[in-house]
């Protein structure tokens, strides 16, 4: 009979007499029977959708279900279940050898092999008393495990305050998975006099706590908090410790302040043994219409430089109510970057936003309405000079106002109008030209003729520019203007065929292209150059009208660009497996418009541009670009890169770059090799591990090699380098990484980063994760925050 009763309940058949008795004894918490006549047909009652958290108001209305070998008791008073006893209500399930439920007090008592599953959190022990609705009670000699972190431990006693808060006495905690053999001890263990956990706030607080790792314990902490999930919480973060060749021993003790769900701040008191104390603060905010972040570092006295040091980095983004202004969109951005001195970028290379030598400060207001768009912007720079390699500061733009109009397919025509007014400010002596104002307009009209296999696009452009100068030019003029027309004709064809290479079927294309451009010569030698530079010679610029970027130089052109591209496309997925291209310019007349201190372009044939991109399988990728000079019969620029990525946590990338010197008399050009990798060393002895999912590694006991080397073949020296190892101990990860960064032609900074991460708990040391992510292509952290698992993944 007992087995039949349990089977009947599991098959959800009409209740047997024993089950009816149990429901009667739990009448206050039972489901109501249908009020229907005896002859009414049976119907299925809808089951509410499964929810992660049951609202508090519904907990007292939920039915209770019991199961066991023997059930006895008195109606409306108590129920006693013996043998394989279980009690289920909502997200609470209790299993025990003997279970007593007292209905007036809503109190459950369990004895013998007791197990509670409360929303996925599991508690096991010999004795329990618990009020079901409020989840108040105690559990003696308990073993527990939390769903969110997978962490757990043992306790002499746990007092349940409510469904979220519990207090464990003489407790331990670890995220190490318990092994089933005598004498097992976790790799790391937190022991505490009391351990208070709050699963709603996802935080644990331990008092009189010790942390042990591999049998070595720390001194006791009066109080220690740790996360029970990925949610943010205020408190001290684990300290970071590093060794730097310039700064010495580097210790940071950050404090995180969770101000609100949409605001937080982190304080970084940082002590460098060779420099002194640095105070850092980072603030972030997120609102419905605006967001931003700011970082401020302040060092009262730098012992090495014997002066005050500081750095500021801010970013703000704002969206306005565009409709009230009659616009489609209206937004603003503000970026502010400033440091105390020119040496800041070399001395503090760990602050990525402030390690550039050109620090931009700009504010912009952007708008759009229909075919119109525009912006009002101010832009200025702080230029950090370095005596061995000085740089010419760019002009500040105070202000820059742009307006653009784009109309597509207007009776078959495409029309655009781009306008720009800029007031340029700089040092006239250093720049060797006067400050001034420039008004620029570019009108463009094209008529595309398109078919599935061909395109022909004739286009005319008109460039107009007007200048006003604060000081006269070399010819005495205080103003100047320029008008330049341009005609271009872009054309191409696309052929397709079925092909087979190396036993694999493809759809192959052949795409010849011809691009002609004519721009008459206009003397621009006396005009200042505020923002123009030569375009890089690549596949993105070879089919463009102007040889220069910016608006101060419009190249005279009478040239034809010829090229052809072929692609191999997988017919099933549509993925591009390979692409090959070649292009060359044929110049019919000299290009006489040049930048200052450069000569006219007289070559009738340009260098040949060749490119290839191969993605034959998802594991392999090769990308090559070659600029070949047919007159000298040698390459003037080469870039070859390859990547091998056969699976998770396995990635090798290599690149070779060559750039010929601009002067023929100079020695060999600039050559460099760049290699990066992440690879499990266990592969060397045949241990391939297992894929546990994104951000979970490949199992414990595995070593990983990580690194990047950027080596200059010309200078025969390492430019930048990262070398390190990671060890995944399943519930802990160890990292040691050596980083070298060049801060000048003959100077470099080196630091060693050690980190010990207790998975799901805390990390000690200096984290190299940002360094590895920035330097290694497709680097995968061994652990990443993931969404908390559903309580139904651990459902009883």
State where each predicted segment sits.
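N-terminal amphipathic/hydrophobic interface segments
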Residues: 33-170, 189-208, 267, 420
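Bacterial N-terminal signal peptides that target proteins for export
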Residues: 2-18
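Extracellular and secretory-pathway beta-repeat/beta-biased strand scaffolds
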Residues: 4, 37-43, 242, 252, ...
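N-terminal acidic, proline/glycine-rich, low-complexity intrinsically disordered segments
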Residues: 1-5, 31-35
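Bacterial N-terminal signal peptides
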Residues: 15-27
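An N-terminal domain-start capping segment
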Residues: 28, 116, 240-241
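Short, intrinsically disordered, low-complexity terminal/loop segments
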Residues: 1-3, 73, 792-796
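Outer-membrane beta-barrel proteins and related beta-barrel translocases across Gram-negative bacteria
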Residues: 121-140, 144-167, 171-190, 196-796
């Amino acid at each position: 009979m007992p087995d039949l009763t349990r089977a009947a309940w599991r098959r959800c058949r009409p209740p047997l007499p024993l089950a009816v008795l149990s429901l009667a004894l739990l009448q206050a918490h039972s489901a109501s029977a249908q009020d229907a006549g005896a002859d009414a047909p049976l119907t299925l009652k809808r089951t509410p959708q499964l929810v992660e958290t049951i609202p508090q108001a519904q907990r007292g209305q939920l039915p209770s279900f019991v199961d066991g070998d023997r059930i006895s008791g008195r109606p409306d008073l108590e129920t006693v279940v013996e043998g394989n006893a279980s009690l289920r209500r909502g997200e609470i399930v209790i299993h025990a050898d003997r279970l007593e439920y007292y209905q007036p007090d809503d109190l459950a008592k369990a004895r013998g092999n007791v197990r509670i599953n409360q929303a996925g959190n599991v508690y096991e022990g010999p004795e329990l008393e618990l009020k079901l609705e409020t989840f108040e009670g105690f559990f003696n000699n308990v073993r527990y495990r939390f769903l969110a972190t997978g962490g757990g431990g043992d306790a002499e006693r746990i007092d349940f305050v409510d469904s979220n808060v519990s207090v464990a006495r003489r407790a331990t905690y670890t995220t190490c998975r318990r092994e089933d053999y005598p004498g097992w001890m976790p790799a790391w263990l937190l022991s505490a006099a009391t351990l208070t956990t709050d699963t709603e706030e996802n935080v644990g607080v331990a008092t009189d706590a010790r942390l042990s790792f591999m049998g070595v314990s720390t001194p006791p902490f009066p109080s220690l908090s740790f996360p029970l999930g990925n949610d943010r919480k205020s408190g001290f973060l684990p300290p970071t410790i590093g060794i730097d060749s310039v700064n010495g021993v580097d210790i940071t003790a950050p404090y995180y302040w969770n101000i609100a769900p949409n605001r937080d701040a982190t304080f970084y008191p940082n002590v460098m043994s060779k420099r002194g104390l640095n105070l850092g603060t980072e603030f972030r905010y997120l609102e419905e219409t605006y967001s931003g972040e700011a970082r401020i570092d302040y060092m009262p006295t730098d012992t090495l430089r014997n002066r005050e040091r500081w750095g500021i980095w801010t970013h703000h983004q704002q969206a306005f109510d565009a409709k009230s202004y009659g616009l489609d969109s209206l937004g603003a951005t503000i970026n502010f970057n400033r440091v105390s001195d020119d040496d800041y970028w070399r001395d503090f290379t760990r602050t990525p936003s402030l390690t550039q030598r050109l620090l931009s400060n700009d504010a912009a207001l952007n708008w759009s309405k229909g075919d119109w768009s525009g912006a009002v912007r101010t832009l200025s720079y702080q230029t950090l000079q370095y005596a061995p390699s000085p740089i010419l500061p760019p002009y500040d733009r105070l202000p820059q106002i742009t307006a653009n109009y784009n109309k597509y397919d207007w009776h078959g025509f495409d029309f655009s109008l781009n306008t720009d007014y800029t007031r340029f400010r700089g040092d006239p002596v250093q720049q060797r030209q006067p400050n001034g104002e420039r008004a620029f307009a570019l009108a463009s009209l094209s008529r595309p003729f398109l078919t599935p296999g061909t395109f022909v696009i004739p286009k005319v452009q008109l460039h107009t520019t007007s200048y006003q100068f604060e000081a006269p030019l070399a010819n005495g003029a205080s103003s100047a203007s320029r008008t330049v027309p341009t005609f271009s004709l872009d054309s191409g064809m696309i052929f397709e065929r079925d092909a087979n290479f190396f036993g694999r079927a493809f759809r192959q294309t052949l795409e010849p292209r011809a691009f002609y451009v004519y721009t008459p010569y206009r003397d621009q030698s006396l005009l200042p150059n505020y923002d123009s530079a030569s375009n890089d010679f690549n596949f993105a610029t070879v089919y463009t009208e102007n040889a220069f970027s910016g608006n101060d130089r419009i190249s005279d052109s009478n040239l034809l660009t010829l090229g052809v591209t072929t692609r191999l496309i997988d017919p099933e997925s549509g993925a591009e497996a390979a692409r090959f291209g070649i292009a060359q310019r044929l110049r019919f007349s000299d290009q006489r418009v040049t930048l200052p201190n450069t000569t006219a372009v007289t070559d009738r044939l340009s260098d040949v541009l060749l490119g290839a991109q191969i993605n034959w399988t998802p594991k392999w990728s090769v990308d090559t670009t070659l600029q070949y000079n047919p007159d000298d019969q040698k390459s003037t620029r080469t870039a070859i890169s390859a990547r091998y990525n056969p699976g998770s946590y396995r990635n090798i990338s290599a690149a070779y770059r060559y750039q010929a010197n601009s002067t023929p008399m100079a020695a060999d050009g600039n050559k460099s090799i760049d290699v990066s990798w992440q690879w499990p060393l266990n592969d060397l002895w045949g241990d391939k591990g297992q894929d546990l999912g994104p951000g979970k590694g490949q199992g414990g006991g595995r070593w990983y090699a990580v690194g990047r080397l950027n080596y200059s073949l010309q200078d025969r020296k390492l430019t930048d380098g990262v070398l390190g190892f990671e060890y995944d101990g399943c519930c802990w990860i160890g990292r040691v990484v050596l980083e070298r960064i060049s801060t000048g032609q003959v100077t470099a900074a080196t630091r060693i980063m050690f980190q010990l991460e207790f998975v799901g708990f805390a990390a000690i040391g200096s984290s190299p994760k940002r360094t590895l992510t920035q330097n290694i292509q497709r680097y995968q952290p061994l652990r990443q925050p993931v969404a908390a698992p559903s309580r139904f993944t651990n459902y009883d």
